[in-house]
Amino acid sequence: KVLLAVIGAAALGGGYYLALTVADAVSAITMFFVAVLLVILGTYCLFTAGSIAVLKLLRKNKNYYYKSRHFTTVSGMIYRMKQNAVGLANICILSTMVLVTVSTTLCMYLGVEDALKRRFVHEVSVVSYYNAMPEHPEEVDALAEASLKDSGRVLTGHSAMLNMSLTAVRTDDGFSVTGIGAGTDYSISDVVLLTILPKSDWENYTGEMVGELGSGEIALAASSACEKGMLALDNETYQVKQICAYPETDHDYLDDMADDSVFMIVPDREALGQIFTELKQDWDEERVSLQIKYNMAFDIDGTAEEKVAAENVLHAAITAYNDGHPSDDAKDSYSRTYVECRAQNRDEYYSLNGGLLFIGLFLGAMFLMVTVLIIFYKQISEGYEDKERYVIMEKVGMSSEEVKESITSQIRIVFFLPLVVAAIHELAAFPIVRRLLALLNLTNVRLYVICMGITFLLFSAIYYIVFRVTSQAYYRIVDGKAI
C-alpha cells in the first residue's frame, strides 16, 4: 500500500508538473494526453492506497484517535475507503471529465467573436505569394482597394507589408533556416517564426520608426529577449543595430502555432531580395517552397450583409487576376493571391464551435449519468452493509444521535472528496488547456475562467442534489427513516 501510494503521488505530481510547466502550444499538444494518463494513474493509486495510508497515520496518533468522535470516524473511514476507493476514483475522474469538457467547449462557443477577431485581425486580408522579388506588388493592393470601393464600402483602415516568413531554429549565434527538418537535432522549444521585412514596410505596418540601417545591419523585434551584437542567419552574419518593441497587437501574418516570434528588419527591399536569393540556393524546394509574401489588410464599413457582398466582389476580382497570371509560368515571379474575410467565416465558426459545444454537452451529460449511477449504487450497497454496523454501534453504548453524526460525517467526506479532487485536477489543467485553446485563437483567459466557474457551480449543484437524494435512500435502509 505504501509503495502504491508513493507511485500515485509521483504520477499525480508528474501529471501536474507537465500541465503547469508547458511552455508553448506545440508542447501542449504532445504533453496533454501524457499528463491525463499520469493524473488518472495517480488518482487511482492515491484513492486506493494514499487515502488509507493517511487514515492509518491518524490512527497511530493516539491523542487524536482515542476520542469518541475521531475513533469511530477514522475507523469507519478506513473501512469505507477499502470498500469504495475504486468507485470514488471513478467518480473523481468522471467529474473531472465533465468539468473540463463542458467548460472548454462552452468557452469555445462563447468566444467565437474573440477567435474571429484574433484570426482575422482585419475585416479583409489579402496575401500575394511570389517566387522571386516582385517589382510591383502594389498592383494587387490597388486592385483590392478599388474593388472594395466599387462595392460602396468605405475603407476605415488599410495597411500593407512585403515580407518573408520562415520557420527557423535558434542556434548559438543566431538562427538556422535551411537546416530545420533536414535531419538536424533541435528541440521544439528552439523553433521560432522568423519574419524578414524591409525597414519601410515595418514602419508603415506598425507605425514605429527605425533608425538608419546600413549594409549588413538589421533591427530586431522579438517576443522574447534579444540583444544587440552579431547575429548569424545560416551562412551570413549581420550586425544588430537596434532593438524594436515587439508589436502588441496581433497581425494576420503571424502564425499562432509559433509561441516565439522574431521580426528581422533589413534596410530595404533590395536587401530582402538578396537574403531571399541566398536562402534559395540552399533551400530544399521539395520540402517546402520559399516565397515572398505581400500582406494587405483592410477594414471596411457596412452591415454584415454589405461586407459579405463586398467580399464576394473582391473574391471575383482576385480570381480573375489569378487566372490572368498563371502560377506555373516560370518567367513570372507571381504565384497566387488569396483572400480571407472575417464576415464570410463567421457562420462557419459558429457552426463548428456550436457542434463542438453540442458534443461537449453530450459527453458531459453521459459522464454525469455514469457518475450518478455509480454514486447511487455505492450509497445503496453501503446502506445494506452499514445496517448491521449501525446496530452494533448502538449496542456498545453510543446514542442514536452520536451514531448518526459519525456516519453522516463519514458519508459527507467520502461523497465530497471526489468533487474536491476533481476541482483541483481542473485547476491544474488550466495552463495546458489555455495553451490548447490558444491554438484555436481563443486567448480570452477571463472568459475561460468564467466558464470554468459556471460549469463548476452547476455541476456542484447537481452533485449536491444527487447527494441529498441518495443519502435519504441510504438512511432509510440503515435506520428505517430519512433524516
List PLM regions with ranges.
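Hydrophobic alpha-helical segments
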Residues: 1-58
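Short cytosolic juxtamembrane segments of multi-pass membrane proteins
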Residues: 1, 384, 475-483
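N-terminal Sec/SRP start-transfer signal
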Residues: 47-95
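Hydrophobic alpha-helical transmembrane segments of multi-pass inner-membrane transport and secretion
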Residues: 4-6, 36-40, 84-108, 347-388, ...
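Short helix-loop junctions at transmembrane helix boundaries
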Residues: 13-31, 418-480
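Basic-flanked hydrophobic alpha-helices used for secretion and membrane insertion
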Residues: 115-129, 134-369
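Alpha-helical transmembrane segments
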Residues: 50, 96-122
